[in-house]
């Protein structure tokens, strides 16, 4: 019954804060050559840290990435960070949507003011919805572990391969970045078994996330 199934559902944030949410955005009119000549990502992080410490721009973090796009003079960004949100609560999620967009335009002003090559940059698009990293955690017939990923585990009931790094996005104090990365050794990919998609206590459902 449903009661049995619910025993195997946990919610992110019950014990430790849930991972942070992110609104991505795209910008045009970026002089990539000038940005790289000024120091690129290392320079960007230095400028972000200076802005946070000086209080000149309301940025939520001291690190971020601005990879280039196929379109000329355009960049995509991963810099917004909205913390302490239960994304299963519609009021909190709505507030996070608003905050994510506010932060995006704060970054636009920062990039124009402080980053060489971005003086004329402008936002040309925002993600249609804020990116939610975790909410409910459904326990499957098998639970993939960190050790499985790092040891490049193999399973007879493998249904897909994954080579992406393990990411854990947390909010630090005063803009410090507490994101933890763990890359799969040797650029390999580990198996994800079918049993991870089958919730404990049910036989008519698949879940993924």
Regions found by a protein language model. Give the residues of each.
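Flavin (FAD/FMN)-binding glycine-rich loop and adjacent Rossmann-like elements that form
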Residues: 2-208
């Amino acid at each position: 019954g449903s009661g049995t199934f619910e025993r195997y559902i946990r919610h992110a944030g019950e014990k430790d804060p849930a991972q942070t949410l992110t609104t991505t955005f795209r910008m045009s009119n970026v002089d990539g050559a000038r940005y790289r000549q000024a120091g690129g990502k290392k320079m960007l992080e230095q400028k972000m840290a200076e802005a946070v410490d000086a209080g000149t721009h309301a940025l939520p973090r001291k690190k971020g990435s601005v990879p280039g796009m196929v379109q000329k003079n355009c960049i995509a960004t991963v810099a917004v960070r909205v913390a302490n949100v239960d994304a299963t609560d519609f009021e909190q999620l709505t507030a996070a949507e608003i905050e994510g967009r506010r932060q995006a335009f704060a970054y636009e002003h920062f990039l124009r003011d402080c980053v060489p090559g971005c003086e004329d940059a402008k936002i040309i698009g925002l993600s249609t919805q804020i990116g939610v990293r975790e909410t409910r955690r459904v326990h499957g017939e098998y639970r993939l572990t960190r050790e499985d990923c790092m040891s490049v585990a193999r399973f007879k009931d493998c249904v897909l391969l994954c080579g992406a790094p393990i990411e854990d996005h947390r909010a630090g104090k005063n803009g410090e970045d507490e994101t933890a990365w763990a890359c799969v050794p040797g650029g390999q990919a580990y198996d994800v078994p079918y049993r991870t998609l089958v919730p404990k206590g049910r036989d008519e459902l698949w879940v993924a996330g």
